[in-house]
A protein has these predicted regions:
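Surface-exposed extracytoplasmic segments
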Residues: 1-203
């Protein structure tokens, strides 16, 4: 995205060309899901990048409806294809330690009872990404989002860890793309969607 695009924008602009400073040059995203032995539905996400900036902030937008083609430059009317309850999963990695995973939903006020005060962005107005009080309270933090990591609903990692002998060899192999990934160029996450309240138990 370019031209000052924000997450809540209804008509974001897709640009191509050079990567802006301090931004990740993403090469691949992966997504998978399955049903756990406890009957919960799990979502698995991963990303790869070519540069090693240290920190990484990725968003995975999951929609009910088909979206515009984001592989070509131009203005995209995502406002017409977002639905109440669509998901935005944020993957925030500070350069060391475990990433922080959080979840917001697309709020409109039409069927979800949301008000502008439920928007996650400061000063946001409906429609927006945020969390109604029933969702916001799931992690015990009043911040208009569900902190999946703090609530124990998700776990994630980036390939930057050392083994017990203090020998660091963080390069891993992606068998799908058949490429080796140096330290801090791969991140993954597993999310319990049932525990997070995205799906009711038994659904």
């Amino acid at each position: 995205f370019g031209q000052g695009t924000k997450e809540d924008d209804l008509t974001p602009t897709v640009v191509n060309g050079s990567i802006p400073p301090n931004k990740s040059d993403l090469t691949r995203f992966y997504i998978a899901n399955n049903d756990g032995s406890n009957g919960h539905k799990f979502l698995y996400l991963a990303w790869e990048r070519t540069n090693t900036l240290g920190s990484a902030n990725m968003d995975f937008e999951i929609n009910k409806l088909a979206q515009p083609d984001m592989t070509t430059p131009g203005t995209k009317n995502v406002g017409a294809t977002r639905s109440p309850g669509d998901l935005l999963i944020r993957y925030d990695f500070g350069g060391s330690g475990a990433p922080v995973l959080s979840l917001v939903k697309w709020l409109t006020g039409a069927t979800d009872g949301a008000v502008s005060g439920d928007c996650n962005a400061s000063g946001g107005t409906l429609p927006c990404w945020g969390a109604v009080p029933a969702d916001d309270s799931k992690d015990g933090i009043n911040d208009n989002q569900i902190d999946l990591s703090a609530a124990g609903f998700a776990d994630g990692a980036v390939n930057v860890l050392c083994n017990g002998a203090n020998k660091c060899n963080d390069t891993i192999h992606d068998p799908i793309a058949n490429v080796d990934l140096p330290s801090a160029t791969f991140g993954e996450a597993a999310i319990d969607l049932t525990a997070a309240g995205v799906f009711p138990a038994g659904q």
